[in-house]
């Protein structure tokens, strides 16, 4: 029986890269996101390559929608096709918005980051993990960030949400220590995706400046790390992985080449 991976935020960036990597690795895919058109396009691409894919359209901030969508997996054609449960949950959905001083930030940006990066992750964990415990198998991979290790200038709330991801990952690992389930916190540094465009509310020039003078990581690099962790032997729990671009030392020290 093929393993099944559920990936949140699968329509772009690290989530989309994880979908392709796990498809190549022979997994069945449950892909979630807010953009139905992008999900359908990715599903078609992966199905054409031979993967088994089901898409679920919802926002992880909507607890009722997330719960209903996940519960539906145990009904209908997908269940009839041999679906036994989620083997790997990749809590990828997340974002940064704005880069202002803490006393000048946008309330709306704060709410969106907290509701997505923390509450959304908690919702998916609460909905999926009990069934993993019942089955006696499963792996939760949370996409954290180097930003969760220490705050950087004007990153305040985003850094706080990723620090929360670390704490939640560590706490869940403790809660599951008596089970065969594993928990991994993957902490990327600079990854060139649509992350910075989103942070700067569509200002591509400002987003591009984030990566000037350094070769950043790609979504594929992080997807490879996630796949490696998921495929490790059952007795091996890769608890935490910090992945940085070669010229990035931590969240604040980056050497940039100048022309």
Regions found by a protein language model. Give the residues of each.
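Conserved glycine-rich Rossmann-like NAD(P)H-binding loop of the short-chain dehydrogenase/reductase
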Residues: 27-41
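Conserved glycine-rich cofactor-binding loop
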Residues: 11-12
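The beta1-alpha1 cofactor-binding region of Rossmann-like NAD(H)/NADP(H)-dependent oxidoreductases
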Residues: 37, 57-71, 107
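Active-site helix of classical SDR
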Residues: 125, 161
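Substrate-binding pocket helix/loop in short-chain dehydrogenase/reductase
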Residues: 100-102, 106-114
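C-terminal helical subdomain
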Residues: 185-189, 205-252
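Residue(s) in the substrate-gating loop at a strand-loop-helix junction
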Residues: 145
